[in-house]
């Protein structure tokens, strides 16, 4: 299943699990899961709410990293190049395994793991998981973000290109949010006021 720009779907998997698929993301899964394991593949970003089944583990294959769960809520995101994978756990417990099926770490609620495929290195940080996965509810948050990061987020959400004059104090960080249902013009006005810059839409 491929989710086109501007849409987030909620396909019901064969076992009754739900998945919120972010725009421009792709999810692959069989019509029926095998009796011993439930395995899906993700490119992009998705949030999973997995139906518990201790005898049939649920595995998400994310290009070099697999996420193994029994029943839980979490998100998985792969970078465009496929060399970085992020996992955020909301409820339950998940284990992260590399391409050699070696367990790297177990995550607990409100933890985020960033895995770097090339050198098989990972970091784990404490986060506000509900806030970071709020995109599935149509809310886009950013915390301690640079102006460049905010611009990329707006461009990705609205599928537009923006230009702006870089401010003198380029080290500033910002926190804020916007709704995906808001008009782009409104979001640009709010962002300009917050950052003190002037974002211009490239036609």
Task: Describe each model-derived feature in a short phrase.
Residues 1-203:
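A residue-level detector for the "anchor" residue at the start of short, highly conserved motifs
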